[in-house]
Amino acid sequence: MGAQPPTNSRSPANGRGAVSGSILKTESLSIHFGGLAALSQVNFQALGGEIRAIIGPNGAGKSTFFNCLTGVLRPTSGRIIFDGQEITGLRSNAISQKGIARSYQITNILPNATVFENVRIAAQSRRHSWNMVAHHNALADINQKAEMALNAVGLLGKAREYASNLSHGEQRNLEIGIALATEPKLLCLDEPTAGMSQAETEETKQLVRRIAKNLTILIVEHDMQVVMELCHRITVLHYGAILAEGTPEEIQNNPKVLEVYLKT
């Protein structure tokens, strides 16, 4: 994560509305790889409508936590409750159907497909069944959802371009558009500003603020300025366990957090 402790230059989550009740909860969530506890007894709760950061040094368990939430990994023990239903151990496609979507640390798009095709494939994945009578209406609905997702991330004007022709920042935002096309209630963003220029980072922060009006967002992010400016609350992981939770102001003044960051 680097040696810089969390700092704050502005109030967090500028322009954000109020949060609501719990949409995601984990109870004693643990996962072991041999004798290594990648996550240990993680009790976590995210509220509807909030932007929530998961931070910590490299190897703290951040990506493992996302992998458990999205069905990439099956927890060794514990429970995951999403929108009132237990989803522990479900496969990724089933969790996506429940309303959880994810972007990845490494850009995960189809470079030889158009921008529109990338998003349309994701929109189509939400269809449970097909029949000849409904086929035409279903296609129109899928296309409309794809256009809405592209409009949300500012890429509708580049819908017919090949994804490989987009800038790095645009490709990262396309991945967010792909996630939005699945109509999630919870969006997990893994390093959304990684490798971006300052201008691209600012555009992505504005994008996250816009889309957060309609869903809950969890962010794993190494750029502490991004975290402090965007998020309502922050959870700090260290060696697979929760070290601290709180507002940006509380986290940046937490002695335990400062000690961990200054030692990395």
Where in the sequence are the language-model features?
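Cationic, low-complexity basic patches in intrinsically disordered or flexible, solvent-exposed regions
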Residues: P5
